[in-house]
């Protein structure tokens, strides 16, 4: 909080957050990794695994999440922020780059803030715990100035990338993304958006690229140089029934060609989405300033890759297993503490019955004759009743609690703890 220009570099977060449900607390969100009231923070080359709740939240402007690995995030999907996302970024000018994310629970994966840059990410296997949503979710106010480029979005029951909301969003840019095996590749509501050189295929019952006729109408939206099996102005309707609104040029649309885009790609099963030499995609596009300036040949190619151009890859640049390992190993202690050998001889056993109505029995073992204290506490840590406070001989013994406090009044139903203290021994 209030820490501008903070840096997290090379950290391994393994089970970093956990709800308190096992303590009977159900209305308190877990403590997660969060930047609040802080600008220009950077999280780089770090791993986040097994979080109960969202993985990371960064608010205010100018944050960067780069080259990070996220796995098995938000496995309960409770007590999330309002939009229900794995990564929540607020403010403006954020960068989300070269990250790998998979096995995610929340309905939406990334909410990037305003005027964000999202590039070179490999994100898949998302949205297991909630309905609706998209891997990259941009609401109305986040669409002007956002740029989503060079990403692999795949293998999920959600949309790939979506300009969402009530149709008032505008001026968002998506280009050079590859989206496959999702439930709707690109979904665009609003107007004056730009969709260039995206490749999309095998995206379930919904279309690969959806430029909505409804909800904003997409007047002024430019759809050029895209390669997909199904491009339409409707979620699932055909191109002939729902022509793409706005400026629609030089796209390879399976609805028009009647063939599968995969037959024109090098080896899509092994992540090689470059066009085959002499395929119908090569030199079939049009030049778009600032987007296709580095094309090879007579004209830009259609789709996310240029034949003879850069063979870009998405996701982290390092190997998880060699960097952090696949399992958690506690760090070595900076110093050692000599343990009291007697401590291991004291034992505090589980009460019985549990739960109970009238009373319950607490059994315990005293290793050496001496002063013993056993007390009952509530969830707030308040001492409710002292059951034992005095000298006891060694051996196994027990005490009964009748669910009353020190004043003899019956306590409310709920969750309580009991604690035993004997010399250096402490157990709850």
Segments from the language model and where they lie:
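Short glycine/acidic-rich loop motifs that flank beta-strands on beta-rich extracellular proteins
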Residues: 1, 7, 17-32, 52-59, ...
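Predominantly extracellular beta-rich ligand-binding scaffolds that present long acidic/polar faces
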Residues: 163-272
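Glycine-centered coil/turn sites that cap beta-strands in beta-rich domains
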Residues: 333-352, 356-378, 386-389, 398-401, ...
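Solenoid scaffold repeats with emphasis on beta-solenoid/beta-helix
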Residues: 5-6, 11, 32, 40-42, ...
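Consensus "Asn ladder" position of solenoid repeat domains
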Residues: 11, 46, 68, 73, ...
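C-terminal tail/sorting-segment detector
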Residues: 386, 391-394, 398-400, 409, ...
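C-terminal accessory segments
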Residues: 255-324, 328-329
